[in-house]
Amino acid sequence: MKIVFSRKGFDTSAGGGPSPIVAGRPVSLPIPAARNAAGAASVTTYGDLGLGEHAARASRGRLGAGDACHHDPMFTREGECLFGQCGAAQTHLERQGVGAGDVFLFFGLFREESGGEPHHRIFGYLRVAELIPLSAGAPAELVERGHPHALAMHARNDCIWRGEGRLAARASEALRLTVPGARPSLLRRPDWLRRGGLSYHDRADRWLRGGKLRAVSRGQEFVADIGSRREAPRAWLESVIAEIRASG
C-alpha cells in the first residue's frame, strides 16, 4: 500500500501566497488555470467557487473572481474526489506503483487566522478506486463536471484518479504538518516514516532528530510505500482520514 503526500493549491510561486483559513476552515485555493494547445483547460473561475475575494487577497490583487482556476482536485457532493495528473508527476506515480486502494493526502500552504503564520497542512484525501486514462478521450460525465483534465489534454499521459474523498472542514492541529514556529518546509513526520521511506527525500540531511523532516521545495507527489503488513502507518493514515471526515 502507498500513501501519497500530494502538494496542491496556492503557494508563493503558484498564485502568490498561502491559502487562507476562514472561520477555522482551511480553504485551499486552486492554482490559476493555463491554456494549452488544445484550448481552454478550465471553465471555472474563482468567483464560480465563491473564492474571488480570497484569491484576490492571497495573490495581492493579481487574481480575482473573474479569473479562471485549475479546479483540481475536485471534490463532489457525492463524496468523491477527481484528481487529474500528467507529465513527470504522473510518470513518477506509475513508477512507484500507485494504484487502486492507495491513498492521496492532499496538503498545501496555509496562513494562520491569528498571527498570519504560513504553514503546511493536510486538507483532504482521496482513496483510489480507479485510474482513468484520457488519451482516448475523457468520459462525458467528467467533461460535464468541468474537470480541467477532462476538458483538454495537458500531456500525453493525462489521466484522472478517482475514488472516495473528502475535504477537511476544520484546521485542526492533527492535520498540521509544519513544526510550530518553524519555516513552512520543516515538517513533523510520523514515527513510522524514516529515511528512505519517502520519494524525493533520500538525502540524509533532510531527516532530522526529533521527528522532523526538511521537505523539498519543488515537486508534487511524494510516495511512501508502507507495504501490506505494517500496522503503525495504517493506523496513522486511518486517524488522519477519520479527522478529515469528522470535521466535514
Language-model segments: residues:
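Short N-terminal edge-element motif at the start of the domain
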Residues: 51-119
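Contiguous surface segments at macromolecular interaction interfaces
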Residues: 1-50, 131-248
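Short beta-strand-centered aromatic/proline hotspots
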Residues: 115-132
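Conserved hydrophobic/aromatic beta-strand scaffold that supports enzyme active sites
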Residues: 5, 103, 123-125
